[in-house]
């Protein structure tokens, strides 16, 4: 196959060894075996201790010479020992593994089991393996469920692009975030003064009223920042080199940092 996407059952333990040990789809990289020697009375009845690496081998051997695969696998497969460690070593020596991404728990709707995404690429241009720890990146849906937002997915994907040296995709993503953020600020600009007026009407202590006044003063700095953003857009479009585009982005962020820090501090003061 050119591409394989798979979410196989985890930790299957009832596969007969005799049904897979002579099948090249499963034995090319080695077969998972029990650590202890099988008793003579049980010969021919032996099972594979865990089916995770049977799935891994199946997907690895199913790829064409330029093929790629992405599979969901139990976390335990990432550091399984004994015969499974030997298979993993073989996959690394074959330079098949492109990346491994550790996911947060509670990403499935029916089980809490944490898992890891394995990525294979038979057309890798180097011998590096990208490891991404995304266990603390999620949106909490409810007490038992989590998911990635669209921004989470884009941010994780851009790590892979940077790993491949594709800085232009990172720069474009940051530019997109700047544009989206500026749009949200402008959308909310008209609402700030009415909200502050309502707060002043209901607050009866001087500290609270002062915090609202300060917050409004900080917000009025947005007009200057709109000028900064317009200048950034001009320089970004003109800049031909990636480093120059990135420099303009850093300058814009430096201009916005005090604005957001002041708003954050003002909201904390108001919350008291």
What is the meaning of each model-derived region?
Residues 2-272:
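A conserved structural/catalytic subdomain of Rossmann-like adenosyl-cofactor enzymes
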